[in-house]
Amino acid sequence: FTSYHNVCYFSGFLYCQFGRRYGAVLSKDGVTTISAAIDGGQPWRRSTGDNVTYTDWRRDSYFTALKDLLKGVKRLGIEFDHVNLDLKVLLEDHFPNVELVDCAAAAMDLRTIKSAEEHVLIRKGAEMCRVGGRAVMEAVKAGVPEHEVAIASTNAMVRAIADSFPFVELMDSWTWFQSG
């Protein structure tokens, strides 16, 4: 998998691309994330499975890691709705005798079946949104700039997330708000 949602769903690790490739290989034995060596070990700490970290000192190190994980593979499921043409060409170049098949719809079907734990997490996420929305309502006043309203909401949500999930590493939390 290469998409944010599938890498996260199947491994527990949500990557932030920063111009480097990320992925997750799901096999009958488990899941292994492939990550750039810029994350301070976060993929290994956050993943439910194994992790292979590659350096980008060589242009194709990502594909070297993939080849190590996929030795002998004849068919490879990729997400046609996420893999761009450049990546597809590179996969075809690096795996010349491998059939690339679309696994996006099947993966989406799997993600639609929610466990009790996922229901709890979804409700908790909705609660964080409610906290942010309430902060927006309290901050909106005549003359208050939009960025101040967004800051109030983001800060409220970050505090609520930190209180509710003290074991997570917060990243990319913000509020999109527009008045008018």
Where are the regions a protein language model picked out?
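Generic secondary-structure signature for well-ordered alpha-helical cores
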Residues: 71, 96, 124-134, 138-145, ...
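A composition/biophysics-driven feature that prefers long, compositionally simple stretches
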Residues: 1-132
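Short catalytic-site patches enriched in acidic/histidine residues
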Residues: 7-17, 104-107, 113, 146-180
